[in-house]
Amino acid sequence: MNTKRIRRDWNAQQRPVIGGSGRAPRRGWRGRVVPLLVVALVLPVVFAGWLWFHVDSSVHRIDAFEDYSGRPEAAAGTNWLVVGSDSREGLDPETAAGLHVGDASGQRTDTIMVAHLPDNSTVPTLISVPRDSRVPVPGQGRTKINEAFAVGGPHLLAQTVEQATGLRIDHYAEVGFGGFAGLVEAVGGVEMCLEGEMHDAKTGQTLQAGCQTLEGPDALTFVRMRYSDATPRSDLDRVANQRRFIGALVSEASSITTLINPFRAYALADEGAGALTMLDSDGPGDLLSLAWAMRGMSSGGLVTTTVPVTDATASKWDRQKASRLFAAMEADDPVPEDLIVN
């Protein structure tokens, strides 16, 4: 055997190729693209999970509604009590002046709504309860429903609504003046088309006719206005405008332009968490269910109306019509057409 030749061949195999770089071969395009795709897929999931945690940990909480003698039994679907309070908590005098909300002390309801999310294929329902409605308030006799919140907060209001409607309230969501304005600002304002000029004789604020983007202060003016030639039915026109605006706000908040923009999505989640008061038994998933149902308002996927009343003062309910409305909601049945008034 020629051992010298074998040794030369072995040494040649160990030498680097002349002119070679000695580096590992470059990765192909797949090696560069795949990691980027993984990051692109994982980051949104991580961001969404963080937003979920942020909302859940930042929202204001109150104790869950307790049972009491005569409380309505749970029925079909799920019922939300949605409240807009005139709370000025956290607003300094300058901010309150900029929002044109005055400086009244105490806390009252500026908006009372009941949202019914059915278990079947029936369209969800959102009804406004006029705040001047005179109903029995536990411990207070027959008085304005607004008084329940002023005296006993969310729990007495929920009990009052339950006894007046026969509907069991499962969830609660409340937003104050400052929180509402912040939500509107977080989505970049909400576009509304006004048929005519709206001038509020009480606050002196004016909204021009035509399509426009309403920012926080103007949005508050729109949803609160009832002393105006543009709202001849006073509170009945006001609550109709509130439902109209909330539908547009939810549509904007759930739009693809908002959801794919991390800065706007964060601002919305942050403002929403800071603005909302919910039951300690409620979570982000419950809130998403409500938002998903309400986003159909502008497209006809949500029935909206007001509790039937006997006159423009909206203080006395039409008991026969109101009973039919509440019975339909309790049974997950469609709301009769003659009860849908906007």
Task: Write out the residue ranges for each language-model feature.
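Non-catalytic, solvent-exposed segments at the cell envelope interface
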Residues: 2-342
